[in-house]
């Protein structure tokens, strides 16, 4: 009797799908490169890397939007020391490269090694005050073979950074990694430092995050965190606001008011899509 093939695990299926998409996008590389040259955008990462961090059509506009938040909400200055957690393929690094002066410093951290390699080759090579670190943290969605321990440390000295940025990082983390990143933010933030982070927050029960008015629905999980996908939770994660406040307080951090709630939950007057938090000591 012929054996039926075993079904693919969700994480394996995702890797196969990703590889196929990357192959397809790689066929567009010559056209994309020509377009970047013609439009004087050679600094942009290639199309297959840009697609990994979001919608191709909004890659640059998203960076511009969040650069404005960095200035307006967290008062970042050109001479400051900046840590970008989840730097991806260098979206915000490109904006900070234009903004920071020679006394400023930028460190980007990401769990995907191909992003870090590209940023080192194309950004650090021309801007020596820009450094990129690969943090091999396991993630079922983004780095399934990662082997960093749960008590990982970002290899930088205590109280090093004036500004820490975490765009769409907590939205893809499970609780143990959220708590560890917050501990690292507390360790690395200077006395007068600020952190700007985007997140999905809920204050009520299950109906708040599964309602029909929501642009995202978090059907799975518990009262602390809820997931959009049962099989690959890191696809999108929402957290109880009280839980986040408690973890911040435990690490001697303060969530500045007001939280700028986003439109993801159906709010018509949200500042951005995700909720925005400014964190200080």
Can you say where each PLM-predicted feature lies in the sequence?
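Conserved beta-strand/loop positions that form the S-adenosyl-L-methionine
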Residues: 85
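A conserved beta-strand element that flanks and buttresses the S-adenosyl-L-methionine
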Residues: 165
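Helix-capping/helix-break motifs at membrane-protein junctions
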Residues: 174-175
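Short catalytic micro-motifs in class I SAM-dependent methyltransferases
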Residues: 168-169
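Class I (Rossmann-like) S-adenosyl-L-methionine-dependent methyltransferase catalytic domain
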Residues: 3-73, 78, 89-96, 107-153, ...
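A short glycine-rich, Lys/Arg-flanked "PGG" loop and its adjoining helix->strand segment in the class I
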Residues: 179-191
């Amino acid at each position: 009797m012929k054996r039926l093939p075993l079904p693919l695990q969700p994480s394996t299926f995702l890797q196969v799908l990703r590889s196929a998409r990357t192959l397809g996008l790689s066929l567009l590389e010559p056209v994309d490169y020509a377009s970047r040259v013609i439009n004087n955008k050679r600094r942009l990462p290639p199309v297959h890397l840009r697609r990994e961090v979001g919608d191709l059509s909004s890659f640059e506009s998203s960076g511009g939007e969040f650069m404005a938040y960095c200035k307006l909400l967290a008062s970042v200055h050109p001479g400051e020391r900046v840590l970008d957690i989840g730097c991806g393929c260098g979206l915000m690094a490109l904006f900070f490269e234009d903004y920071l002066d020679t006394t400023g410093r930028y460190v980007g951290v990401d769990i995907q090694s191909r992003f870090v390699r590209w940023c080192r080759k194309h950004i650090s090579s021309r801007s020596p005050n820009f450094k990129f670190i690969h943090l091999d943290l396991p993630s079922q969605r983004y780095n399934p073979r990662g082997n960093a321990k749960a008590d990982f440390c970002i290899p930088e000295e205590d109280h090093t950074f004036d500004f820490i940025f975490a765009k769409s990082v907590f939205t893809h983390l499970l609780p143990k990694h959220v708590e560890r990143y917050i501990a690292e933010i507390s360790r690395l933030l200077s006395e007068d430092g600020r952190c700007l982070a985007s997140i999905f927050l809920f204050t009520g029960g299950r109906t708040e995050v599964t309602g029909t008015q929501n642009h995202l629905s978090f059907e799975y999980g518990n009262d602390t965190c809820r997931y959009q996908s049962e099989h690959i939770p890191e696809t999108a994660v929402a957290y109880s606001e009280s839980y986040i406040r408690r973890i911040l307080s435990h690490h001697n951090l303060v969530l500045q008011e007001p939280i700028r709630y986003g439109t993801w939950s159906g709010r018509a007057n949200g500042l951005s899509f995700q909720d925005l938090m400014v964190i200080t000591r």
